[in-house]
A protein has these predicted regions:
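Terminal, non-catalytic domain-edge segments
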Residues: 4-121
Length: 121
């Protein structure tokens, strides 16, 4: 979810009910979890497969070294000016923090009055 959130912040098109402060706080927490320790990097300094540390069993057959750098897309907001609300808004609890603390939170979903089905056969 980091890459789409970062892109939406960069495009200044965050969904209603999702603030810049929430997105920045969530992205920052994930980045700290991933990058504060050195267990996500091999002896050559390259990223390894895993959320936290080396977890090669989570790889799919199509995973390759380039796949490991998709998290870098979460840095897209670095292209926003320092005065942008993404940087200047106060940090706020994000959806999972609200959910697990018992606070009210908006459901993340798409609603459509039109029901579409698709035959698979």
């Amino acid at each position: 979810a980091m890459q789409p959130l970062a892109l939406m912040a960069w495009y200044e098109q965050l969904p209603a009910g999702l603030s810049n402060g929430q997105v920045r706080a969530a992205l920052t927490a994930v980045m700290h979890r991933m990058f504060d320790g050195q267990e996500n990097f091999n002896e050559g300094g390259f990223l390894t497969i895993g959320f936290v540390g080396r977890q090669p069993n989570i790889a799919d057959w199509y995973t390759n070294n380039g796949s490991l750098y998709l998290p870098s897309l979460a840095f897209l907001p670095l292209g926003l000016p320092a005065t942008h609300p993404f940087w200047s808004d106060a940090p706020q609890p994000w959806t999972s923090q609200k959910a697990w603390s018992g606070a009210p939170f908006p459901k993340d979903h798409h609603w459509s009055d039109e029901i579409r089905t698709r035959d698979l056969f």
